[in-house]
């Protein structure tokens, strides 16, 4: 049986979700989003979920130990036995060290894009407040300006989808991820990948790149 353990790192708006979803489908392993895992714990009102909510409600970062515990619980599930794709984790060096000790990865993909590209992607996003459909002014525009194709409701933008906020988040990401990148580079597990362009098309290029080194990332169990 083949086992593949991957993590995707990258700044907000680089397309981690799109890449992860396609790789998950093609490799037949679960795509695990840290944000979704945290929200699930909150919605289920678990002990960990209550701890997470106590930090999130105050606008604070959730401590590494709590995030590690939630991720570890999910990775122990039976559907992760043959591999998984982590999206948005590890974010910090302590998280990476924890993961390497208990659930060592085969490869860590570093999705890279310029600040200009990230600003264009994020600031061009449009959302339907009624049905949740998403659009983009450049590559997925609605048929009528600012009107949802599905339900006819006026589209909106997120308040934090501004160039100033995106730039600040991008710089915060670079400062936080740098030790994690160095950690996996030293382990020989880092796969830098230029994510400039159509995420759907590039995801399959990434898949081919990973498959070309399958002897390194696919381990016979």
Feature map (PLM): residue ranges:
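Glycine-rich phosphate-binding loop of ATP-dependent small-molecule kinases
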Residues: 1-221
């Amino acid at each position: 049986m083949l086992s593949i353990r991957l993590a995707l790192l990258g700044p907000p708006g680089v397309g981690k979700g799109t890449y992860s979803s396609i790789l998950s489908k093609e490799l037949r392993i679960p795509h695990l989003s840290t944000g979704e895992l945290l929200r699930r714990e909150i919605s289920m009102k678990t002990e960990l979920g209550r701890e997470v909510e106590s930090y999130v409600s105050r606008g604070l970062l959730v401590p590494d130990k709590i995030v590690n515990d939630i991720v570890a619980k999910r990775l122990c599930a039976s559907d992760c036995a043959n591999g998984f794709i982590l999206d948005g984790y590890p974010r910090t060096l302590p998280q990476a060290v924890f993961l390497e000790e208990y659930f060592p990865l085969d490869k860590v993909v570093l999705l890279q894009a310029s600040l200009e590209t990230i600003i264009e992607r994020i600031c061009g996003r449009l959302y339907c407040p009624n049905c949740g459909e998403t659009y983009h002014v450049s590559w997925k525009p609605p048929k009528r300006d600012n009107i949802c194709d599905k339900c006819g409701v006026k589209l909106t933008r997120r308040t934090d989808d501004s160039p100033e906020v995106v730039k600040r988040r991008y710089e915060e990401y670079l400062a936080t991820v740098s030790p994690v990148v160095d950690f996996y580079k030293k382990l020989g597990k880092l796969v830098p990948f230029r994510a400039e362009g159509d995420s759907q098309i590039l995801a399959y290029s990434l898949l081919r790149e990973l498959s070309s080194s399958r002897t390194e990332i696919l381990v016979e169990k």
